């Protein structure tokens, strides 16, 4: 959790920054199923540290603030890392009713909705669709949207928890964004 809360990450590697979301979701589910108070207390402490570190903008990943800008609001692998955080926040809310977790999930979703969507940044470079992409060589790394080899399908990762957020909140903007993502898949 220290690695995430310190927000100094600028490298493409995701291995350190995706584990906290997985752990929190698993710890909550295991703690609840086993009625393990010690595990739940530890999970609550870790979750609180992450939620308390969330920036006013809604960003809660490991990437340095100096790296991010309006033109590059996330580091290439943020979507992978934050996918698990989204799920943890929503699962904790669904299992416990913790409103801070729901608020954190909404703030994170709104961060993505602010930067990615119709007329904004996209997860897939529009000139890399068939037939324009035939015989075109591309760099396999993207500064803001993941991995070029799979045409930046990171939006589909985030579509899942953001659609879950729509189911929990009923806020149509989350459904609309998820439909936009799905509608842009070749």
Language-model features, listed with the residues they occupy:
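Glycan-recognition and catalytic cores of secretory/periplasmic carbohydrate-active enzymes
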Residues: 1-186
């Amino acid at each position: 959790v220290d690695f995430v809360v310190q927000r100094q990450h600028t490298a493409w590697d995701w291995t350190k920054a995706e584990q906290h979301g997985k752990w929190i979701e698993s710890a909550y589910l295991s703690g609840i199923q086993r009625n393990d108070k010690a595990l739940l207390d530890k999970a609550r402490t870790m979750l609180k540290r992450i939620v308390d570190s969330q920036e006013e903008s809604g960003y809660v990943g490991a990437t340095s603030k100096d790296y991010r800008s309006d033109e590059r609001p996330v580091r290439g692998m943020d979507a992978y890392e934050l996918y698990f955080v989204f799920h943890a926040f929503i699962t904790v809310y669904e299992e416990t009713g913790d409103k801070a977790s729901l608020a954190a999930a909404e703030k994170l979703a709104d961060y993505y909705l602010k930067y990615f969507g119709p007329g904004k940044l996209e997860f897939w470079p529009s000139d890399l669709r068939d037939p324009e992409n035939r015989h075109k060589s591309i760099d396999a790394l993207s500064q803001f949207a993941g991995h070029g080899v799979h045409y930046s399908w990171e939006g589909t990762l985030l579509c899942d928890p953001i659609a879950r957020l729509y189911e929990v909140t009923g806020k149509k903007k989350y459904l609309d964004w998820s439909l936009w993502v799905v509608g842009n898949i070749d």
